[in-house]
């Protein structure tokens, strides 16, 4: 059997063994995709014992390509929500998550200096302790750029594997410990979250308001600032028994009922100006109006602002809200449409059908992947990651590398959405498939390279010490920030658990947090709020630590 055939066969075996290990769960918690790393270690141990020789060049290419695929698809997935998460609505959660990253970096630096841990080893421990595989790839990349011997770089994967299991368990232990310390009643926390509905970011809500302000009588909607802006959408108006879709020229009268869509604070301001909230239903049922969800798939409208399409004037149809990559947004007139946007339309059936034709609404297009933008994005990302930035006093030029470059490029392209007929939207199923393929390839190679000396390091070497160092890097930031968030910010416990899981980019921890109260969306919401920024920081941090430690000796 040729070297290439043998290498591919071994990688396939690693994937099978690793995915099987990852699917084994104890009390609902498992290693998940991280099991591939341990599958690689097991197979790598026996490959080393058997004296087999695998193609090192091929393994290196597969490892790097897997990493590129993984970080690129993550960037495309979270790009639309990344910049939104930095706005005021998610600022508090992101600040706490950033604090976790900073404290983790400080603990790593202190351990490195106190115990004289080799640079590749401490970076591997850091990456494993925070359960972040792209951080491992980024760290290995910068070490190679700094001229570190390959046998030392491979130690990073081994120390990563030592710290990884407690990284998974440590966050679960932290959630449990904080619950005990603060005597949390999960049901009460869920009810509090449901009553406020503002944790992690302002949600889109709807209210019905009766016009009671005499100053608004006989004014057109376009002349009422709170209704003519981009923060509140008036999607329905009911006068006596008639329900209609209002246009900017529609004149409102005392006693009219308005159905408004917006964020809670903006709706409260509208209520102060217009009148009292009422329980009267403004449902389209039994009327000549209907509500429909339409998907943007027509290339001719990509990048166009909602106001430029004149749906209100031409079709008497109102866009009440917009869903982009799972994030609900107020459909302000200045928003530019992107491929895959889901719009809530209110209007007559024939008018909605006409608007749907303009927007595309071709569901089959959502299942198709444009491969040209994928490779354009990857190519641009690799180029971006290869650009050197020279900093005086540093031994090597800083680069984003094969982990940071594709990630940042994907975040930008995901936010832009489309350029002409090229759109970077990727169906969730395709994105997940490419992402899982990438991480399986990457972890398989890392595990294989680490497997030969893993048992010896664990039993006769410093493996147990590495596990202890990793436990500190995992636990100290989580416990510190958890206590601060609860005591100082009075953060909801379920929201805090989601934030902690997001700060470790740890899906098993999110699953655990969701199971604390299955019907509450608090944990998932805060996880999604901090995930994009934290993923970016987790990839950049090992590179900064590596250059810092290298420069100060």
Swiss-Prot record:
Pfam families: Asp-Al_Ex (PF06826), TrkA_C (PF02080). GO terms for cellular component: plasma membrane. InterPro entries: AAE_transporter (IPR050144), RCK_C (IPR006037), RCK_C_sf (IPR036721), Transpt_YidE_put (IPR023018), YidE_YbjL (IPR006512). One of its GO terms (molecular function) is monoatomic cation transmembrane transporter activity. It comes from the Bacteria. GO terms for biological process: potassium ion transport. The chain crosses the membrane at residues 4-24, 28-48, 65-85, 95-115, 158-178, 371-391, 393-413, 439-459, 464-484, 493-513, 533-553. Residues 191-276, 279-361 form the RCK C-terminal domain. SUPFAM superfamilies: TrkA C-terminal domain-like. Keywords: Cell membrane, Membrane, Repeat, Transmembrane, Transmembrane helix, Transport. It is found in: Cell membrane. Gene3D superfamilies: Regulator of K+ conductance, C-terminal domain. It is a multi-pass membrane protein. Belongs to the AAE transporter (TC 2.A.81) family. YidE subfamily. NCBIfam families: PRK03818.1, YidE_YbjL_dupl. This is Putative transport protein YidE. The lineage of its organism: Bacteria, Pseudomonadati, Pseudomonadota, Gammaproteobacteria, Enterobacterales. The gene is yidE.
């Amino acid at each position: 059997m040729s070297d290439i055939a043998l290498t591919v066969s071994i990688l396939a075996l690693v994937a099978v063994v690793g995915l099987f290990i990852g699917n084994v769960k104890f009390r609902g918690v498992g290693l998940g995709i991280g099991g591939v790393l341990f599958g690689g270690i097991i197979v790598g141990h026996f490959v080393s014992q058997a004296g087999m020789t695998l193609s090192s060049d091929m393994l290196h290419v597969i490892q790097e390509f897997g990493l590129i695929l993984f970080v690129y698809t993550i960037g495309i997935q979270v790009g639309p929500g990344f910049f939104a998460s930095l706005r005021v609505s998610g600022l508090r959660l992101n600040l706490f998550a950033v604090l976790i990253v900073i404290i983790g970096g400080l603990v790593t630096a202190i351990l490195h200096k106190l115990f004289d841990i080799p640079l590749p080893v401490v970076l591997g421990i850091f990456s494993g302790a925070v359960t972040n595989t792209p951080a491992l790839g980024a760290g290995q990349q910068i070490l190679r750029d700094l001229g570190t011997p390959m046998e030392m770089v491979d130690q990073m994967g081994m120390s990563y594997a030592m710290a990884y299991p407690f990284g998974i368990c440590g966050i679960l232990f932290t959630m449990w410990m904080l619950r005990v310390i603060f005597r949390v009643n999960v049901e009460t926390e869920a009810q509090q979250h449901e009553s406020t509905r503002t944790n992690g970011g302002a949600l889109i809500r709807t209210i019905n308001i009766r016009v009671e302000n005499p100053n608004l009588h006989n004014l057109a909607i376009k002349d009422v600032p709170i209704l003519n802006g981009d923060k509140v959408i008036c999607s329905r108006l009911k006068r006596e028994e008639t329900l209609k879709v209002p246009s900017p020229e529609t004149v409102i009268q005392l006693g009219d009922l308005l159905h408004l869509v917006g964020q809670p604070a903006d709706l409260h301001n509208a209520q102060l100006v217009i009148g009292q909230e009422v329980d009267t239903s403004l449902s389209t049922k039994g009327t000549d109006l209907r509500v429909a969800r339409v998907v943007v798939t027509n290339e001719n409208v990509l990048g166009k602002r909602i106001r430029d399409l004149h749906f209100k004037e031409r079709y008497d149809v109102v866009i009440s809200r917009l869903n982009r990559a799972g994030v609900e947004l107020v459909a302000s007139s200045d928003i530019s449409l992107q491929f895959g946007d889901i719009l809530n339309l209110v209007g007559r059936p024939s008018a909605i059908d006409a608007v749907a034709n303009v927007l595309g609404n071709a569901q089959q297009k959502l299942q198709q992947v444009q491969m040209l933008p994928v490779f354009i994005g990857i190519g641009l990302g690799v180029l971006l990651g290869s650009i050197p930035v020279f900093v005086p006093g540093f031994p090597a030029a800083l680069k984003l590398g094969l982990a940071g470059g594709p990630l940042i490029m994907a975040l930008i392209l995901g936010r832009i959405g489309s350029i002409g007929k090229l759109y970077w939207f990727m169906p969730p199923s395709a994105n997940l498939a490419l992402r899982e393929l990438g991480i399986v390839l990457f972890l398989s190679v890392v595990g294989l390279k680490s497997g030969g000396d893993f048992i010896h390091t664990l039993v006769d070497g410093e493996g147990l010490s590495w596990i202890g160092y990793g436990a500190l890097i995992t636990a100290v930031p989580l416990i510190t920030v958890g206590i601060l968030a609860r005591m100082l910010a009075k953060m909801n416990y379920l929201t805090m658990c989601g934030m902690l899981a997001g700060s470790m980019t740890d899906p098993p921890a999110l699953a655990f947090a969701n199971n604390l109260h299955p019907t509450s969306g608090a944990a998932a919401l805060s996880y999604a709020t901090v995930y994009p920024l934290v993923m970016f920081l987790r990839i950049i941090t090992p590179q900064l630590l590596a250059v810092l430690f290298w420069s100060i000796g």
